[in-house]
Amino acid sequence: MNIIAIMNDLSAYFKEEPLRELHQELEKEGFRIAYPKDRNDLLKLIENNSRLCGVIFDWDKYNLELSAEISELNKLLPIYAFANTYSTLDVNMSDLRLNVRFFEYALGSAQDIATKIRQSTDQYIDTILPPLTKALFKYVKEEKYTVCTPGHMGGTAFDKSPVGSLFYDFFGENTMRSDISISVSELGSLLDHSGPHRDAEEYIARTFNADRSYIVTNGTSTANKIVGMYSSPAGATILIDRNCHKSLTHLMMMSNVVPVYLRPTRNAYGILGGIPQSEFTRASIEEKVKNTPNATWPVHAVVTNSTYDGLFYNTEYIKNTLDVKSIHFDSAWVPYTNFHPIYQGKAGMSGERVPGKIIYETQSTHKLLAAFSQASMIHVKGEINEETFNEAYMMHTSTSPHYGIVASTETAAAMMKGNAGKRLINGSIERAIRFRKEIRRLRTESDGWFFDVWQPDNIDEVACWPLNPRNEWHGFPNIDNDHMYLDPIKVTLLTPGLSPNGTLEEEGIPASIVSKYLDEHGIIVEKTGPYNLLFLFSIGIDKTKALSLLRALTDFKRVYDLNLRVKNVLPSLYNEAPDFYKEMRIQELAQGIHALVKHHNLPDLMYRAFEVLPKLVMTPHDAFQEEVRGNIEPCALDDMLGKVSANMILPYPPGVPVVMPGEMLTKESRPVLSFLQMLCEIGAHYPGFETDIHGVHRDGATGKYMVVVLKQGADEPGDKPSDTVKKAPGKKPSAAKKS
């Protein structure tokens, strides 16, 4: 950070010469000098070059108006105003709050001014650095000798080996030297929440509107388990979104709780539509509890917000309606909701405390903010027992955390403070909306087919767009009013072949083919559905990346319309099975997969597969205990009906479990099996198009798709721990009496 911008006024020698002297002295101090052409050029420079650390301008020419504009972009950026001896400053006390320092045009004073600018720059850097990151930088600069972990000793061990030196050179000196031991007392402790680590957590809590925040260094998968372990004692009942992330299934395998599921909707595209409002009512929960063996009134609830596809809930409704004392919003995909007004009322930390309730929000900082992979946060609003919570925290946290991950989490929060954070998110929203409009324009102008966007017809308003029951674009005919909202930065493109009402067209282009084409051209899709592709317009997306995506999509249309050979369009796919794809053309491939989808009537099958849940025979915890006891056996997927699954079965997409450990597929839930069989059939017919299904594998010898089930008898009464587990205190609730 060493760039100073000078707005040079060449109208008078007595102004030009002092600035020329200052230029020379600033270069001696290690600064680089930029000369913007005009006011707009300067503001663009400030907006686009984050390494700018100061602005110099002539007070007579630019004065307070420019100072205010600079402050709007970066209120902490040092501003240096030069005035001649006879200038009228005309400033009041509120103006002096702007970060302006005044100097007089005078020959021979350049060295002194350059020294003051260096001091102001150092102070600026010190001010913008958050507490732990600042302490870490300071420690690394001190170059202390250590005789403790980690064994690479600031990278010196790597330099003792040829391959180690390559590793060192790739990652760099500061990465090595900042990887330090928890024995460094001046940095405090992540596990004890002391020193700069505690300061960092408090800094994050203020930034994210939380009462308490925790830094998690191994992802939101772990953050979810920490919250769940604290909130759900063994034998208790929890209310959980059936579209939960698999980490919450793992929580239920670790902690012997009884799950009661909130059932979400799904449209013909396979897009998750959220949980209806009726599912959150007391009457609905009473009915679920009554129909679930060993269930009592839930002590904890988990809701995924937003959904993977970018749908937010009206969280105020959930907080005030759901009669559960502890509510956890798994918000892994939306760590930015506190930094733009369109998300108000749609996030866990929105608004004030809810009396008598604890609200948790877990966020993957690394997913859509600027942090290292695995950086995550837990935010809390409400009263918790911090000592007990910390036991759950320590249970899941390494005693050797990577300080780079911790500091990146805090730095991500620092980047989002004030106007700077709002501008970053606003930029993402604007780029996403421009991209959406460009797709619609190209669709209108294209000959024949082109991609469409899953969105309302009118997106001129910068907002989270509501899914109303009177609109058809979203494909959820019975959706509640004022309940679900589409995030503009989650862009879902639609490929030809399927209408919003679930009608399969005569011809279609499965999205998996487009996804493979984009991958060939260096563009990775976030999620690929049957006829839709999800793209995330995070703060790291710029105009170049958006234009590259547009270009690749138009190129795909061209090669598809030309009906080129698969080996020329998708060479990686061709190399997987050259004999199979030798003469095949791209349209034949697309229509072949589309015909399979039509044969199975995918929209109807997908609807039925998620309409009826498998039978709960035992809790996920009990099923896992049977597995570790060895009471399991392999089973062909086709023969799974009537058997208890040992593992979760999770096809990707959509990336949520269709069968939980301890559940049995029955005649009523047969569509779940048919759905899985269809996914496997497509992969068997077309090499390279296998669906990744957690819990299902293909036997190399027989070619059959296999699962793991519990041995017969393992689920008999008396053989499973749940028969002896203590129930949570309290009786089953009735409509007449609150529990």
Curated annotation (Swiss-Prot):
It catalyses: L-lysine + H(+) = cadaverine + CO2. One of its GO terms (biological process) is arginine catabolic process. Residues 714-739 are annotated as: Disordered. It is found in: Cytoplasm. GO terms for molecular function: arginine decarboxylase activity; lysine decarboxylase activity; pyridoxal phosphate binding. The modification N6-(pyridoxal phosphate)lysine is found at residue 367. Its cofactor is pyridoxal 5'-phosphate. Residues 714-726 have a biased composition (Basic and acidic residues). Belongs to the Orn/Lys/Arg decarboxylase class-I family. This is Lysine decarboxylase.
